Curated annotation (Swiss-Prot):
It is an enzyme of class 4 (lyase). Its EC number is 4.2.1.-. It comes from Rhizobium johnstonii (strain DSM 114642 / LMG 32736 / 3841). Belongs to the D-glutamate cyclase family. The keyword Endoplasmic reticulum does not apply. InterPro entries: D-Glu_cyclase, Putative_hydro-lyase, UPF0317. Keywords: Lyase. This is Putative hydro-lyase RL2444. It comes from the Bacteria. Pfam families: D-Glu_cyclase.
Length: 269
């Protein structure tokens, strides 16, 4: 995970500035560390014929696919998520999928937009990571400046139409006392994956080797730590890829939509 530098963090201290930098092409990388205190979202953009099934998939799998916004058909805006927000330009980098294959990674999708597309914004773990760090829980992948480790599991999502497949999880190594606190903190944030779905014993959820993540980068685990697993926003991208729609767009990994919604608004209790 590429952490935004101190100078860049100051420049991108608010969501509008971060989206403007994405829109004008001056920022095309990961958004971790930008606009601290505000919700960042994963994106899935699909033809309207698939929208109802994908919505059902998200509703049936809220841990992996916590919805924070949906656009009207053909609209590149989700007013609840931001002033002057344009889905076509305000994400640093996108992924375009054709028949389940990665076709391009553009920084602007204006020329690909159509009146038939529906946008789904899905909660991102950057929000709960900020809460963990604010409460004194260190995260090694953040400290070391690389992406979080993510794994396919043997936990099957509840299918909907063409969308099905295993849950993808992210892993953060924590000392036992910190793991307990992490459960307490993240359970209050169901809109960004909520509490962990599993702690320890990776083989019991189908993960054979923590040193070989399916996505992201390996993260060292110290002898006094245990792996803590959260449902991950890569899940919807993986099931979209497996469903092989003729056309779909997602965000590129780590390149999120930065919204105007405060993280505090996601705290459920």
């Amino acid at each position: 995970m590429n952490i935004v530098s101190n100078r860049q963090e100051q420049a991108f201290s608010n969501p509008l500035a971060m989206r403007a930098a994405s829109r004008n092409g001056s920022w095309t990388r990961e958004t971790s560390g930008a606009a601290l205190g505000y919700v960042q979202a994963n994106l899935a953009i699909l033809p309207s014929a698939l929208a109802d099934d994908f919505l059902r998939f998200c509703v049936r799998n809220p841990k992996a696919c916590p919805l924070v916004g949906i656009s009207e058909k053909g609209s590149p805006r989700i007013p609840d998520l931001g002033v002057d927000l344009d889905i076509r330009t305000d994400v640093p980098r996108y992924r375009v999928w054709e028949d389940g294959e990665l076709a391009a990674e553009p920084t602007d999708i204006s020329d690909l937009w159509s009146d038939d597309l529906v946008v789904f914004a899905i909660g991102c773990s950057f929000s709960f990571e900020e809460a963990l760090i604010a409460n004194g829980i260190g995260l090694r992948h953040v400290a070391e400046g690389h992406n979080v480790a993510m794994y396919r599991t043997n936990i099957e999502c509840v299918p909907a139409g063409p969308f099905s497949g295993p849950m993808v999880v992210s892993m953060r190594p924590l000392a036992p006392a910190d793991a307990i606190r992490a459960v307490q903190i993240t359970s209050r944030m169901p809109a960004v994956h909520g509490a962990p779905i599993h702690i320890g014993l990776p083989a019991s959820i189908g993960i054979e080797n923590l040193d070989q993540p399916d996505y992201g980068d390996p993260t060292r685990i110290m002898p006094d730590e245990m792996p803590v697993f959260w449902a991950c926003g890569v899940t919807p991208q993986a099931v979209i890829q497996a469903a092989r729609p003729k056309f779909a767009i997602t965000h590129a990994p780590g390149c999120m939509l930065v919204t105007d919604k405060p993280n505090a608004a996601l705290i459920a209790f």
